[in-house]
Design a protein with these regions (language model features):
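Conserved nucleotide-sugar donor-binding
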Residues: 46-51, 62-75
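The conserved acidic donor/metal-binding loop of glycosyltransferases
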Residues: 2-6
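A conserved catalytic-core signature of glycosyltransferases
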Residues: 35, 39, 43, 59-62, ...
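Conserved donor NDP-sugar-binding/catalytic core segment of glycosyltransferases
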Residues: 11-36
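A short acidic, helix-capping loop that chelates divalent metal ions and anchors anionic groups
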Residues: 33-35, 71, 105-110
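A secondary-structure boundary/capping signal
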Residues: 1, 27-28, 67-68, 100
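Hydrophobic helical membrane-anchoring modules
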Residues: 14-17, 47, 54-55, 78-148
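GHKL-family ATP-binding catalytic core of two-component histidine kinases
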Residues: 8-9, 68
Length: 148
């Protein structure tokens, strides 16, 4: 969850209702309280990312997400990975669900995002994700008790 107070921890309860049936449950910021320009950038970036990943996720930037630990442990980490969390979870043959959550105007801090790091860098990261997806090996390490 972000520290800018644009979402509320209370909405985690909405996500937790479905975590038994899905490996990732994530929020979609309903009625976003951001500027027109920020919302436009987000729609463009999410649309392109969705086209490249085919994950169907509307709002990957929503900070409210809950996921199973076993899946979280298998995520490859890299700069900008947060944009691809749903796609990386889907590579593990998981199921995801998106749920509308509340969104509030920013009351604290300033955004660290601007045109360059909201559009250009994620654009390039999409190609890196596609490269990685072609080479991804979905595996699980089983428990093996050698000492009984």
């Amino acid at each position: 969850m972000d520290a800018d107070l644009q979402t509320t921890p209370e909405d985690f309860n909405l996500l937790l209702k479905d975590i038994a049936d899905y490996q990732l449950v994530m929020g979609i910021r309903a009625n976003r309280k951001d500027s027109f320009f920020k919302n436009l950038q987000s729609k463009i970036a999410n649309g392109f990312r969705r086209m490249m990943t085919h994950d169907g996720v509307q709002d990957t930037g929503c900070p409210l997400k809950v996921l199973h630990t076993a899946y979280a442990k298998r995520i490859p980490f890299f700069t900008g990975m947060h944009r691809f969390l749903p796609a990386l979870i889907l590579l593990q043959d998981a199921k995801i669900k998106q749920i509308p959550v509340r969104h509030f105007p920013r009351v604290a801090g300033t955004s660290k995002y601007h045109l360059w790091n909201r559009l250009v860098s994620p654009f390039l990261d999409c190609f890196a994700y596609r490269w990685m997806k072609k080479r991804y090996i979905n595996y699980r390490v089983g428990d093996n008790n050698l000492m009984e």
